[in-house]
Amino acid sequence: MAFIDKCKIVLIAGNGGDGIVSWRRETHVPEGGPAGGNGGNGGSIWFVGNHNETSLEFLKYKKIIRAKHGEKGDIKNQHGANAEDVFINVPLGTVVYNPITNEILADINIDQQKYLVAQGGLGGHGNTHFKSPFNKAPNLYELGELGENVEVLLELKTIADIGIIGLPNAGKSTLISTFTNAKPKTANYMFTTLNPVLGTIYRDQNRIIFADIPGLIEGAHTGVGLGHDFLKHIERCFLLIHLISLDPNDNPDIINAYETIVNELKQYKQNLVNKPIVLVANKIDQIGALENLQILKEYLKNNQEIKIISALTNLHVDNMLDDVIKIYFAQKKIYEQRLKEQLPVDQILKWTSDIPKSKELDKTIEIIKVDDHIFEVFGEYLKYWAHRIPLKTQDNLIRFNQKLQSINFNQQLLQAGAVAGDSIKIYDITLEFEE
């Protein structure tokens, strides 16, 4: 199965249901009055952080995700049912981008935190809503709002709690297979692992995910080898295991092998070297390993502890793992406390939608003369109300005209050169201009 850490999807929220015109017809109610119900709200689409998810694989073939529309209103003042919202569980560490501007819209790091991505449209009002002392029998109704339609880019920057890094053939795949459920491909040649391999263990009712990050080589920070594709995955790990092979056949120059990884981390992002890094020397059972270990110790001059193991024979692996997990829990506690102080429980993603809500409408209009007596008029305010108010009743025609008057529509047309009898196109509506 391919590892999916980036995908682009279109999210289409549901439209609001339409309101209706209806009248009470009971024989014992001589002046029945309006009885048209409102439409239900369209379904919204949310992202939900979920610690049980580890990949975006489930979105690989879902290019478009839709929520259902609200139901239309009914007679006897019955409102249409609201559509159910759609909740998409994504792994913690998922970053949501605007694919056009590359702006970060959300950084999902808390389990069960919800992010509103595409908002469903409000239901349209039925004629009962418009009843007033001045209009006891309104022949007015609205269509439901359109749901938001957005495209987002998802990138998984955290695939694991603990990352295992090192040069190719350091023994990372063998190590992760000794204490987790991972079954990576292992062999004695470089780049056996071409995708991150995830393994899971449980401690104190906590699930801890390890990632065998494919081997790094010199120049990885510039994209050489597997480069950027996998360096980004270690940015969000709580700590790193720097695994180095003591086998002279793998690393005849042990100092260069050590510094290659350290330098690549620094070059990619300086703060990576500030993470807790546990240095683990592997293959201690190989000929020449003790000599390489001594060279490494002398070079580090007690500035960093070296944990010595053999992943192949499982020598000292359990002790090393216990120490790593203690560091992990300490780092996780600090991180979660910071998040609680900074973030609310739920967030609404802020972006410019092509379906603005009525309270946020820009009333600016653009008038284009397309022929001698034909004008086309555009604008957010016009687009919104041209959809919401169907011109099928006299009352709705009057209401739509009032919306036009509120933005000095006629005056602006006169200034643009319109005269009586000209055709005015407002999206799907064509009107005859009257001075």
Curated annotation (Swiss-Prot):
> For binding GTP, which residues are annotated in this chain's numbering?
166-173, 191-195, 212-215, 282-285, 310-312
Could you tell me the keywords of this UniProt record? Cytoplasm, GTP-binding, Hydrolase, Magnesium, Metal-binding, Nucleotide-binding
Q: Superkingdom, according to UniProt? A: Bacteria
Question: For the OCT domain, which residue ranges apply?
Answer: 357-435
Keyword Magnesium assigned to the entry: answer is yes
Q: Which PROSITE patterns match?
A: G_OBG (PS51710), GTP1_OBG (PS00905), OBG (PS51883), OCT (PS51881)
* Protein's GO biological process: ribosome biogenesis
The protein, known as: GTPase Obg
